[in-house]
């Protein structure tokens, strides 16, 4: 959608501060839609964060999907939230206190593999993809954002 492309552009600017080669492409809402579907409990309330993240991880990595990619999520109420604030909220989910892309903040960070390499031997690549879907919690409008990035083996420093 146009709104997800605009948010992707804003986010790209923010991520470039952490990784000057970063690009962010808006993709369809499929991943975010799947994430939003498992975000609420049976009563329709938003799950507590740890449960929500675990359930989204289970949903998005079914059948070993995205095993070579980091998955970050952000979700928040959208009342009075413009594209810049949306992008800032998403950037917070990806960037660590050191100002770099933080793969430990990815919901599946401990499971990502590149060939037989994992953990500290791998890092996020440069191509980020953003999936965004609006959903409701009671009467409140929320957005679910899923950002994925293929992992790569760290270059020897």
Feature-to-residue mapping (PLM):
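Short, well-ordered surface patches within globular domains
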Residues: 2-65, 126
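A well-ordered secondary-structure block
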Residues: 56-157
């Amino acid at each position: 959608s146009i709104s997800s492309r605009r948010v992707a552009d804003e986010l790209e600017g923010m991520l470039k501060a952490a990784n000057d080669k970063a690009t962010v492409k808006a993709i369809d809402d499929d991943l975010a839609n799947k994430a939003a579907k498992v975000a609420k409990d049976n009563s329709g309330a938003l799950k507590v964060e740890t449960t929500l993240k675990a359930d989204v991880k289970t949903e998005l990595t079914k059948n070993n999907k995205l095993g070579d990619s980091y998955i970050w999520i952000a979700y928040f109420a959208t009342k009075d939230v413009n594209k810049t604030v949306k992008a800032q909220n998403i950037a917070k989910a990806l960037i660590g206190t050191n100002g770099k892309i933080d793969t430990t903040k990815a919901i599946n960070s401990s499971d990502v593999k590149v060939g037989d390499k994992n953990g500290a031997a791998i890092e996020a690549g440069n191509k980020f993809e953003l999936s965004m879907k609006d959903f409701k919690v009671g009467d409140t409008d929320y957005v679910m954002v899923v950002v994925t990035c293929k992992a790569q083996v760290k270059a020897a420093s």
